[in-house]
Amino acid sequence: VMAASNEIELSRMVKTAAEYNSGPISFRYPRGNAFGLDMPERIEALKIGKGKIIKKGEKIALLNLGTRIEEVKKASDILDSMGLSCTIADARFAKPLDTELIKDLSKNHELMITIEEGSSGGFGAHVLMHLAEQGILDDGFKIRNLYLPDIFIQQGDASDMYAQAGLNSENIVKTVLKVFGINKSEFKIIKS
C-alpha cells in the first residue's frame, strides 16, 4: 500500500505497481494538482517497503505518508527557526512498513509526528503498534499521530479542508510545541 508525496513519487509508484508480480499492490492516487516538479527522463521503480529521508535533523522526526509533504517541509522550517531541529521522512509505504526507517527515527529523535491523509487506525496507528511491540515506547519516546478526524468536513478549497482537519504546517508546529510544553505565544509563528 503506497501513498505518493508528489508527482515524481506517483510516477515511481505506478511503475512499481506495473512491475510487481508477487501479489496485490495498491497506491493512493492524490486529489488535486501536481506540485509542478521537473520530471526525470527515466522513472525508476521503488524498492517495496522502503521510505526515504528527505532532510536530516536531530530532535523531531516528521514521518509523512502522502501529499502533505509540502506542509511538513513548511512546519520543519518553522520548527528549525525555533531551534527544534527536524528530520523529514517520506514513508512511501503504509504496508509493508519500513521498520528500519522507523527504528532509526525513534533511536535518533525525542519525538516522532506521523502525518497522513488517512483516518484513525491507519498508518500512524500501524507505526505506533510497531513501536510498542518493539519496546521503544518503554523508555519515554514520544509519538503523536496526525490524521483525518472522524468528522464531516465541509467541502471547499483543499487548503481550507486540510486546515480544518489539522493537517497543515501550523497544526504540525502546534502539536510539537504542545508535546514539549512550549507556549506558542513565546514564538512568532509565520502562517504559510
Locate each region found by the language model:
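Active-site core segments that coordinate phosphate-bearing ligands/cofactors
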Residues: V1-S5, M39-P40
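Conserved glycine-bearing catalytic or ligand-binding loops at nucleotide- and phosphate-handling centers
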Residues: A3-Y20
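Thiamine diphosphate
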Residues: E19-S192
